[in-house]
């Protein structure tokens, strides 16, 4: 099944890409755009960098789509509308390539657990997740374990979990 394929791929030997500091993302965007003759403001660079949260795949998507938006206008000057459109397209691509496949094959209760986690802005105490679900901590622990085993969430400290998949919290909030 698709769940087992995703689990196999996650367990395969991989190179772990950590989040990139936002100042480095901003500098990389500036260097890339400007070295290619594109004009982009410091404010636009900051907006583009901040929205990526340093996630490597999102960096790639945002940069590509901002560039593409300006290119579609046949312009070498990035305007705010290019940044906005680029960010929107990057989110759509990330949702389709990462978030939607991640949720496929999960049970209704697995998803309910994730939606309860998404109510927090950061790591969620497991007791709060259970309360949001309207379930006992022991009941919710079954789904916590399944999601941990599937690498969808991670334990940040004892009794606390967070999303292991970047931007999944935001996707769930937009699509509840």
Model-identified regions with their sequence ranges:
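Short, small-residue-biased leader/transition segments that mark boundaries at the very start
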Residues: 2-4
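Short glycine-/polar-rich loops that comprise or flank the Walker A/P-loop
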Residues: 8-13
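Conserved small helical "lid"/interfacial subdomain of P-loop NTPases
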Residues: 17-44
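Winged-helix-like regulatory helical subdomains adjacent to P-loop NTPase cores
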Residues: 42, 54, 60-137
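Short amphipathic alpha-helical interaction segments
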Residues: 133-150
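A short, conserved structural fragment
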Residues: 148-158
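Minor-groove-contacting beta-hairpin "wing" of winged helix-turn-helix DNA-binding domains
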Residues: 159-166
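Short, amphipathic alpha-helical interaction segments positioned at domain boundaries
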Residues: 167-176
